[in-house]
Amino acid sequence: LTNTNNYPLHSLQNHQWFKLICGASFQELNVIRNLTLVYALAGADCIDVAADPAVIAVAQSALQVAENLSDWLKNRGFPPVKKPWLMVSFNDGEDPHFRKAEFDFQQCPTNCWRPCEKVCPVSAIVFQQPHLSRSGASQQEYSGIIDSKCYGCGRCLPVCPSGLIYARSYVSTPQAIAPLISELAIDAIEIHTQIGREADFARLWQSLKGWVKNLKLLAISCPDGVGLISYLAKLQDIISPLPCSLLWQTDGRPMSGDIGAGTTLAAIKLGQKVLDANLSGYVQLAGGTNNYTIPKLRELKLLPALTDYYATGREKQLNNPININSLSLPARQGQHINNYINGVAYGSYARVLLAPIWQKLEEMQNDQVNLADSLPLENFPGLLEEALLLARELVTQIKPQNIRKTV
């Protein structure tokens, strides 16, 4: 990794920004470490993690490992990778990204077919399974929701036949984390908000603004709704003057990118709406983004046209079997370059994409019977390269220049 602090800003300016969302409520340290490592090596510009000191520390350690693997990258023909920015997320009120599902398994009917277990995208719901704590210590068989795995997608809430599952929401406590912005070399923060919460946003901003001088980027994430643009304009007044860059994250359909291709339409539609408002700052999609997002953005002229890409042919492969033309949105005509989307953030899709790798890693680690501790991903170079190739198929959609050299 090359420690070039301005590289992510260059990506924003050139409409090639790629952000990995680990999850504002996701705290499974081993997975966060490996996600950070793989997507940093794949060329991500930003890694977005929970405002949790343990999560921040494990992400930082993964970035250091990525830096140590620069020769490994070069020897396999991968392009050199710049160090991504590390971002932490806060919320100014109740928000689906900042919640955990809960239920008392002792109330579950014995004959329940457990649809909650089947619908959970991260296998956070278990029944009579042994699992490890965040520290790695063994625990007894457990039934319920593994708190560190749950990231608040809410898919289990409506499917429980007995209505036993509920969401436990929480609001950020920036007083504990804000001082770490400088200490832990955090590059960016993101504030999740919703229309009508100007007072809540202002209170949170008062707790954070003293540390903003140490940041390279402030991101504000907001879903669509009546009065969105005027609300964002009010937020801009609250944070002005801002000593760092500003990014609007348009949260189309939160935590849904792994469900299907069509979820990307809400993100694109909202991004187009914010672009048309001509607010100051960069615009980045999130919420329903997946491998169909970039091809659709190019088709709609919301990203610069490809000129000399397709060297690997992977983009064409990645777009099958769905025809992106079946995802209907009106195309723009003759837009100025400043009205292009600046980047895309991927959360659930990027995580699910690598889930088979984590399963293989667990099996390989279990085979190391003579070791007291499980070996990290980088100790299995073949598996690391397999994960990297998967991640790069997604990253190179928006960074077509990052093709792999023949070795």
Annotate each predicted stretch with a short phrase.
Residues 1-22, 72-83, 407:
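N-terminal amphipathic alpha-helix/helix-capping segment at the start of soluble metabolic enzymes
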Residues 11-58, 174-177, 181-186, 196-198, ...:
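Conserved N-terminal beta1-alpha1 strand-loop-helix module at the mouth
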Residues 16-31, 92-110, 164-172:
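Active-site mouth loops of central-metabolism enzymes
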Residues 33, 44-45, 51, 158, ...:
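Conserved mixed alpha/beta catalytic, RNA-binding, or beta-rich assembly cores of soluble enzyme
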Residues 56-88, 206-217, 269-278:
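Alpha-helix-loop-beta-strand connector modules within alpha/beta enzyme cores
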Residues 113-138, 143-145, 155-171:
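Iron-sulfur cluster-binding cysteine motifs and their immediate structural context
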Residues 303-306, 337-407:
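C-terminal functional modules
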Residues 319-325:
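Intrinsic-disorder-associated, low-complexity terminal segments enriched in Asp/Asn/His/Tyr and depleted
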